[in-house]
Swiss-Prot record:
Function: Involved in transcription antitermination. Required for transcription of ribosomal RNA (rRNA) genes. Binds specifically to the boxA antiterminator sequence of the ribosomal RNA (rrn) operons.
Native species: Chlorobaculum tepidum (strain ATCC 49652 / DSM 12025 / NBRC 103806 / TLS) (Chlorobium tepidum)
Protein name: Transcription antitermination protein NusB
Gene Ontology molecular function: RNA binding
Pfam families referenced in this protein's UniProt entry, alphabetically: NusB
């Protein structure tokens, strides 16, 4: 069974797609897509609204990261779905402190497999997100707490190497 957050992420991708194609506001796009069950769940709405607003408010910054890592691609040439999957994952990495970056990247890859028009989209999304994540980590841009702390396995590997 899909995780509840996966369903919310999929709804966010659909809402972003709607915003790209129609002259509607964020609330209208969300209202068309969200089920009563989701709208009645305060935790679901908190996650949905926080992530959606993070994408909308920080779109220019997020798009700069994408443009920097898509050397041979003009932003207008990237498929709308792929672009929005990248935006969502980057917003999650940057603005959802309790979600591990690897989870955000893996969720984006799975959503790309489901929604994108080609089999190559998930590989494209994976490559771009991995490169951006590595740069963000090097720049100290990743701020995580609790469950969202940056990959404990990397810390364990480093300790193991230091003990040799």
């Amino acid at each position: 069974m899909k995780t509840y957050r996966r369903q919310l992420r999929e709804k966010i991708i659909q809402a972003l797609y709607t915003l790209e194609l129609r002259d509607v506001d964020t609330d209208s796009a969300a209202n068309w897509l969200l089920t009563k069950e989701i709208m009645d769940d305060p935790n679901a709405m908190k996650f949905f609204n926080h992530l959606m607003q993070s994408i909308v408010r920080n779109r220019e910054e997020i798009d700069r990261y994408i443009a920097k890592h898509t050397f041979n691609w003009d932003m207008s040439r990237i498929a709308i779905i792929d672009k929005n999957i990248l935006r969502m994952a980057l917003a999650e990495i940057l603005y959802c402190e309790d979600i591990p970056p690897k989870v955000s990247i893996n969720e984006a890859i799975e959503i790309a497999k489901k929604f994108s028009s080609t089999d190559k989209s998930s590989k494209f999304v994976n490559g771009i997100l991995d490169a951006i994540f590595n740069d963000m980590k090097a720049e100290g841009r990743i701020k995580k707490c609790g469950r969202g702390l940056v990959d404990h396995s990397e810390q364990k590997m480093q300790k193991t190497e230091n003990n040799r």
